[in-house]
Amino acid sequence: MPRLRRVSRLLLAVGLAAGSATCGTDDLTRESPDGLRPDLAAGPPERLAITRQPPGSALDQEVWEPGRQPTVVVRDGAGVKVPGAVVTASIAGGGGSLQGSLTKTTNANGIAAFTDLGIAGAGTHTLRFSAGTAGVTSSSLVLNPLPPEAQTGKWDPPVPWDIVPLHLSLMPTGKLLGWGKYEPDGRMGMPRLWNPSAGPPTGASMIHADTMLFCAGHALMADGRLMVSGGHKDDDRGLDVTNIFDPVTESWIGGLPRMAKGRWYPTVTTLADGRLVTVAGRDTTSTVVLVPEIWEGGRWVELPGASLRLPYYPRQFLAPNGKVFYAGERVQARWLDVDAVTAKGRGRWSTSSSLVHLWPFNRDYGSAVMYDTGRILVVGGGGDLNWSTPDPRSSTPTATAETIDLNGSGPRWSATDQMHFPRRHLNATVLPDGKVLVTGGTSSGGFNTMAGAVRAAEAWDPETGRWTLLASNAVDRVYHSVSLLLPDGTVLHGASGDANVPNTAQRYPREPSHEVFRPPYLFRGTRPTVTGLSKTVVTWGERFNVSTPNAAQITRVRWIRLGSVTHAFDTNQRANTLAFSVGSGVVKVTVPNNSRRAPPGHYVLFLLNRNGVPSTGTIVQVR
């Protein structure tokens, strides 16, 4: 008799097989315990059971963790598991909108595993899972409203330093190297190396430097060392020294070749091949330095063909065409080709009537950031009537912002929304979710009017072009303030002052402290988790794997170059949105295809879900 039932079931299965086209090759080769292929043994779906319920509680719109995503088993009328059945999820009760991939196909064991569900709409809900005419309803799920911080972010209380860290760089080791002008007792300021995971920065290791690094330029080199160009001889007078900090030995490298000229307030930019170019500043006699110098072969080489007067700390970036793009603070933008040869020698600046900002006045002490490949946001600045070509309509800074796209045949300018506050001495920091955070600064005219200090942060969204007002910090941070993205996705905003009021013996208030801003995305549910990388040193065009249980939930991958910031400009910061594909438990990431888009060095890699919630960052080197 058992043999007869078995033959009957086989004949029935053969009849059903002609209409089945939903199972894969792997399913056709698997066998059930009684030796029958499950796709041939099963009839149409008639019974569904939830083998893992949705979470009992979650946040509104949260993408539920992989271990809390529902799974459903599908059986036919005889209790045989049905592979290849399409299961659809929907809201059964409580209203709201179900988000994520709403249909899943059962595997060879008849299991449909959902991967990225979430519900928009606070309250109590139930879900319905259906396959054919069969269905099952989940247990209740309570969705709690998002906290206010999911819209505004949140500031941690101020944390003291022994110095004012108005120069600050994130090292590939995860430590922060910072320095100011003075020690608390008035002596020459010495750098501090701080490990954020080891406690507060008070008492952080002092890394002795032989020269005063205040008002130098700096950028991270391709190998992760920090190049520091110039320094402070006196106000408006720069040093010709070169200092390189090694984060592995945690020491300065001595005996390096000097520059041809001293530099006070220069900008250092890392090029596509790892060379560095330093421009602008004032020399030991307070004369404006016209000729750039390039660091190559372990020494500085002048570029006399590129002689040009530029403002302090020029806002410039390596562009996708391999040249350096000068984006301000002056109205006229320019290109620098370090390898061109002219009648005056090596190097050449070029410009045209079309390379002009939309805002027709100088943005002194405004900020700029490359928020994605070849795309720059220029924001704020101006307001000092003692500065050249001030805005005659106003003695206050501007709230305007504009974008520059360097990806085409020529730069393209576009106007974007204005900030909620005019600002100078602001900092612009690119975030993992693609937005740009602006912190600090003053809204009043004059060089550094403390009465106009702005504590409210705001964020610009490149997808909408709009600014969102965020939470306010506790301390006024204006001239000499800094902001820096940390690998955990928070932003350190610190320093201010530690300098003399121009043309007086008075000093601005010192702020030897920092505050940490936790952006809104950190209050929108559980973060994706990274469990490992196939490699942490990659090259251009290469693919590498990021292991994560959240692979099916990842909608965006970005990396952001380690920051090195001072005087309202992060010379090292730039971001790329990376191509990727998803496998089982893995995200396969593709590195940009050339070093003009992603210059050699270290980046913090983030995986993001559809709500813009990032993983904790992982530092990756491209070379």
Give, region by region, the residue ranges found by the protein language model.
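Bacterial N-terminal signal peptides that target proteins for export
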Residues: M1-L11
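C-terminal motif of bacterial Sec signal peptides marking the signal peptidase cleavage site
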Residues: G19-T22
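Bacterial signal peptide processing site
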Residues: G24-D27
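Short S/T/G/P-enriched beta-strand
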Residues: R30-P83, G93-L98, T124, G132-P147
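Extracellular/surface recognition and adhesion modules
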Residues: I50, V72, A89, G110, ...
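Short, acidic Ser/Thr/Gly-rich low-complexity loop/linker segments typical of extracellular
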Residues: G100-I111
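Exposed beta-strand face motif in extracellular beta-rich ectodomains
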Residues: G123-L127, G601-Y603
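Kelch-like beta-propeller repeat domains
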Residues: N144-R623
